[in-house]
Design a protein with these regions (language model features):
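N-terminal beta-strand motif that seeds the catalytic metal site of vicinal oxygen chelate
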Residues: 1-20, 78-80, 132-136
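Conserved catalytic-core motifs of GNAT/GCN5-like acyltransferases
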Residues: 12, 32-39, 104-110, 136
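Core segments of cupin and vicinal oxygen chelate
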Residues: 13-62
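Residue-level detector of beta-strand structural context in well-folded domains
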Residues: 45-46, 80, 119
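Helix-adjacent hinge/juxtasegments
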Residues: 70-83
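Vicinal oxygen chelate
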Residues: 2-4, 83, 92-136
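Exposed loop/turn and edge beta-strand positions of beta-sandwich/beta-sheet ligand-binding modules
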Residues: 42-44, 76, 115
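Short, conserved charged micro-motifs
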Residues: 20-21, 87-92
Length: 136
């Protein structure tokens, strides 16, 4: 029987400055910043939690033995889409109120479950952040 995944539990982003990045995601996207013990005598790690998901925030220069990770750790290389219950106009107003430049949108895009209305911006490392809501 083939293995089939059914959900994404967490992902890891590599960043230049954990404190700057986590504060941006907390302030702009309302994520909760948590510090956790990875076990094995390793240093504590920081994550961003929202809904039933989390993003582990890895310093791009962390030792690969200390933090087992992908072969290439480049800050600013992510392209992430987050879902919100807010309208695109509310997202635009929120981003503008916090001085975040809008790269594109609102625009219709194709999501995993249908048509999205998306607004794009960039996080402190330059990763592309898409904030979206599904059309009714």
């Amino acid at each position: 029987m083939p293995v089939r995944v059914h959900a994404l539990d967490h992902l890891v982003i590599n960043v230049a400055d954990v404190a700057v990045t986590t504060e941006w995601y907390r302030k702009i996207l309302g994520m909760e910043v948590k510090v956790f013990d990875p076990g094995g005598g390793k240093a504590p790690r920081t994550s961003l939690q929202f809904g039933q998901q989390k993003i582990n925030v890895r310093p791009r220069d962390a030792d690969k033995v200390e933090w087992f990770t992908a072969d290439h750790q480049t800050a600013g290389s992510e392209d992430l889409c987050f879902l919100t219950a807010s309208t695109p106009d509310e997202v635009v107003a929120h981003l503008k109120a916090h001085g975040v430049a809008i790269e594109e949108g609102p625009a219709a895009k194709q999501g995993a479950r249908g048509t999205l209305r998306s607004v794009y911006c960039r996080d402190p490392d330059g990763s592309l952040i898409e904030i979206s809501s599904y059309e009714d």
